[in-house]
From Swiss-Prot:
Interacts with the Sec translocase complex via SecD. Specifically interacts with transmembrane segments of nascent integral membrane proteins during membrane integration. PANTHER family: CYTOCHROME C OXIDASE ASSEMBLY PROTEIN COX18, MITOCHONDRIAL, OXA1. One of its GO terms (biological process) is protein transport. HAMAP family: YidC_type1 (MF_01810). This is Membrane protein insertase YidC. It comes from Neisseria gonorrhoeae (strain ATCC 700825 / FA 1090). The keyword Isomerase does not apply. InterPro entries: Membr_insert_YidC, Membr_insert_YidC_N, YidC/ALB3/OXA1/COX18, YidC/Oxa/ALB_C, YidC_ALB_C, YidC_periplasmic_sf. It is a multi-pass membrane protein. It is found in: Cell inner membrane. Required for the insertion and/or proper folding and/or complex formation of integral membrane proteins into the membrane. Involved in integration of membrane proteins that insert both dependently and independently of the Sec translocase complex, as well as at least some lipoproteins. Aids folding of multispanning membrane proteins. It comes from the Bacteria. Belongs to the OXA1/ALB3/YidC family. Type 1 subfamily. The lineage of its organism: Bacteria, Pseudomonadati, Pseudomonadota, Betaproteobacteria, Neisseriales.
Length: 545
């Protein structure tokens, strides 16, 4: 395959990898008509402005949480084991309600008409500081008795976990049956998380999984379009007996879990109602309303939902809820990126270093493809050896394209050359390249994972551009092993394109560039060996099969 084809295939891979979501956006979820028509008075409560917070601080080994004492909202969540993007001296902050962005978790109880029964009343807690000393730490927020109902909101944080259990304890002293539901929400604005860029841009926004609708992204842009179209409400509504919903961003997520893996669904009293929308205050809400069984006079009841707010670590989230690992955004190539990451993870478990695991994975992929690529590289070597004869044909027939093509086809037949044979290696590598790109880009396991020396974060670009420069050198070396173009313009492009691609790779994750460098080095060794073998055979006058 000549360099023109190589360039074309490489460009196609980059376009698919980077621009797939823009070229083929995820179809907009269409809620069931009867569900979309439903209205609840909870809307007004849900869209109330975030009031100033009276903070309660909870510190565990994994997180530092700030809860608003009055509303009971989880207003700030710092992940203590992860460093901030671009600032290793600070921990990563997931939730926040400051000037820079709004991203909070809310929960409340609704009456039969959908009204927040504690609106304007507020909770209180016995103290303002909580620290994990055992396996769990509990924060109990108590509200004044309202219409005969005594309500506590209880947060339970667990050691070495990013799961937070949010429970309502209800005592009905009203003398009549209480019909309530609990509403759990993730609310955020449209601000871009730190570290987003053109080559490092990932989906940010609501996600939902239900058995009926499977996994879906409900993008901010779709909700914005609904709002701009003049609809009275811009939202996605669905009823479901189980599932999960929330918000995701690069490497991190926050989701309400309706059914823990191997456990019972919180929707046992009736289908839960999922509602994802853009609110009138231009914040975005992903909420679920959980119906409670009727609470008889004098009886007590509780309802609890787990909130997972933390990293998208595959081995962790896969054990929290069914299909929660789908929230790890591999784009359109999840079917290929997921098994690639599984293999990479197995190698890491053995080797103990993600960088060397990538090197070994590259060798394995190269070995698997060897039987096919070897025949293709031999075809390229034959084409290279036949280049002088091709030039002679071009000079002999000049502008007579028909005669020139006939002579070239006869030469290919005589020399046993498949002119398309060289395309196969690149075609085979494109899905691997794209799949590995997303596997490396989306996996929080590689976030701030070192390889050696100057590479301290395989998920981010090489800070000194050493790997991209090495990659450019390997691409230049490959051009001399490929059949030389007879067209002067192609010859110039052959020298320029390695530089162009290496500049593009300045912005790619170092782990991906490492894969491509190792792959190029292996390819160079393979092509050099084949070229030398064929040249030796031709010098001896042998016919190469």
């Amino acid at each position: 395959m000549d360099f023109k084809r190589l360039t074309a295939f490489f460009a196609i891979a980059l376009v698919i990898m980077i621009g797939w979501e823009k070229m083929f956006p995820t179809p907009k979820p269409v809620p069931a008509p009867q569900q979309a028509a439903q209205k609840q008075a909870a809307t007004a409560s849900a869209e109330a402005a975030l009031a100033p917070a009276t903070p309660i601080t909870v510190t565990t080994d994994t997180v530092q949480a700030v809860i608003d004492e009055k509303s009971g909202d989880l207003r700030r969540l710092t992940l203590l084991k992860y460093k901030a993007t671009g600032d290793e001296n600070k921990p990563f902050v997931l939730f926040g309600d400051g000037k820079e962005y709004t991203y909070v978790a809310q929960s409340e109880l609704l009456d039969a008409q959908g009204n927040n029964i504690l609106k304007g009343i507020g909770f209180s807690a016995p103290k303002k500081q909580y620290t994990l000393n055992g396996d769990t730490v509990e924060v109990r927020l108590s509200a004044p008795e309202t219409n005969g109902l005594k309500i506590d909101k209880v947060y339970t944080f667990t050691k070495d976990s990013y799961l937070v259990n949010v429970r309502f304890d209800i005592a009905n002293g009203s003398g009549q049956t209480a019909n309530l539901s609990a509403d759990y929400r993730i609310v955020r604005d449209h601000s871009e998380p730190e570290g987003q860029g053109y080559f490092t841009h990932s989906y940010v926004g609501p996600v939902v999984y239900t058995p009926e609708g499977n996994f879906q992204k409900v993008s901010f842009s779709d909700l914005d379009d609904d709002a701009k179209s003049g609809k009275s409400e811009a939202e996605y509504i669905r009823k479901t007996p189980t599932g999960w919903l929330g918000m995701i961003e690069h490497h991190f997520m926050s989701t309400w879990i309706l059914q823990p893996k191997g456990g019972q669904s919180v929707c046992a009293a009736g289908d839960c109602r999922i509602d994802i929308k853009r609110r009138s205050d231009k914040l975005y809400s992903a909420s679920v309303s959980v119906p409670l069984a009727a609470i008889q006079a004098g009886a007590k009841a509780e309802t609890a939902v787990n909130l997972y707010a933390g990293p998208q670590t595959t081995s962790v989230i896969a054990n929290i809820a069914d299909n929660l690992q789908l929230a790890k955004d591999y784009g359109k190539v999840h079917w290929f990126a997921s098994p690639l990451f599984w293999l990479l993870n197995q190698l890491h478990n053995i080797i103990g270093n993600w960088g060397w695991a990538i090197v070994v994975l590259t060798i394995i992929v190269k070995a698997v493809l060897y039987p096919l690529t070897n025949a293709s590289y031999r075809s390229m070597a034959k084409m290279r050896a036949a280049a002088p004869k091709l030039q002679t044909i071009k000079e002999k027939y000049g502008d007579d394209r028909m005669a020139q093509q006939q002579a070239m086809m006869q030469l290919y037949k005589d020399e046993k050359i498949n002119p398309l044979g060289g395309c196969l290696p690149m075609l085979l590598q494109i899905p691997v390249f794209i799949g590995l790109y997303w596997a490396l880009f989306a996996s929080v396991e590689l976030r701030q994972a070192p390889w050696l020396g100057w590479i301290t974060d395989l998920s981010r670009a090489d800070p000194y551009y050493i790997l991209p420069i090495i990659m450019a050198a390997t691409m230049f070396a490959q051009t001399y092993l490929n059949p030389p173009p007879t067209d002067p313009m192609q010859a110039k492009m052959m020298k320029i394109m390695p530089l162009v691609f290496s500049v593009m790779f300045f912005f790619f994750p170092a782990g991906l560039v490492l894969y491509w460098v190792v792959n190029n080095l292996l390819t160079i060794a393979q092509q050099w060996h084949i070229n030398r073998s064929i040249e030796k055979q031709r010098a001896q006058g042998e016919v190469v099969s």
